Amino acid sequence: MEYSQSSMYSSPSSWSSSQESLLWNESCFLDQSSEPQAFFCPNYDYSDDFFSFESPEMMIKEEIQNGDVSNSEEEEKVGIDEERSYRGVRKRPWGKFAAEIRDSTRNGIRVWLGTFDKAEEAALAYDQAAFATKGSLATLNFPVEVVRESLKKMENVNLHDGGSPVMALKRKHSLRNRPRGKKRSSSSSSSSSNSSSCSSSSSTSSTSRSSSKQSVVKQESGTLVVFEDLGAEYLEQLLMSSC
């Protein structure tokens, strides 16, 4: 079957009535509902029209904003942890932490337990004293199990000798630096003994020098005169010993 070029490019007037009715279907025109009129076709899929696509710049900006929010929240949490305060602990101006408690066995007098390098150490010292006096009724900074185990590990501490447990713990904490003090006192005593021995030896040597010096004896008109040559070295020794 052959088609002529004229038949392929025929005018629209030569279309059949069925083709015209298909193109000009009334259902594809305006919606007849009471809503504002808009172009509507029942066979068209409008699902894609409800999705909005953002540009890459907008997506990056939102991610940066979300990251800044999360970072600020983390910084706030870290600041809260660093500024945490413990019961019975006070920070000293030079950076140390002091622990103190009111001794209920001594009419509530305030007792200074000691100074510590870390706030946690001072808080544990307070918990030990509070638990030793009040038991499970005490308000602690750390769990009861932790405080009980720390008391068991402490040596040479008798909390039940009839006195105040708070004072016993205070004496224990004050003994932490005692070995250093003993070492210093022993070193100072040894240095003083060394200095005294040096001074005694210098004095004996000076006397021996003076005794070994020859004396000049001169007799004039029945009078005996003795002259001793002290020397410059003996004079310097006397000046040093007098200072």
Curated annotation (Swiss-Prot):
Residues 157-220 are annotated as: Disordered. Its main location: nucleus. SUPFAM superfamilies: DNA-binding domain. Residues 186-212 have a biased composition (Low complexity). Induction: Weakly induced by Pseudomonas syringae tomato (avirulent avrRpt2 strain), but also by mock inoculation. One of its GO terms (molecular function) is DNA-binding transcription factor activity. GO terms for cellular component: nucleus. The keyword Transcription regulation applies. CDD domains: AP2 (cd00018). A motif (Nuclear localization signal) lies at residues 170-186. GO terms for biological process: defense response; ethylene-activated signaling pathway. Coiled coil: none annotated. It holds the Pfam family AP2. It is found in: Nucleus. InterPro entries: AP2/ERF_dom (IPR001471), AP2/ERF_dom_sf (IPR036955), DNA-bd_dom_sf (IPR016177), ERF_plant (IPR044808). Residues 85-143 bind DNA. PROSITE patterns: AP2_ERF. May act as a transcriptional activator. Binds to the GCC-box pathogenesis-related promoter element. Involved in the regulation of gene expression by stress factors and by components of stress signal transduction pathways. Belongs to the AP2/ERF transcription factor family. ERF subfamily. This is Ethylene-responsive transcription factor 15. It comes from Arabidopsis thaliana (Mouse-ear cress). The gene is ERF15.
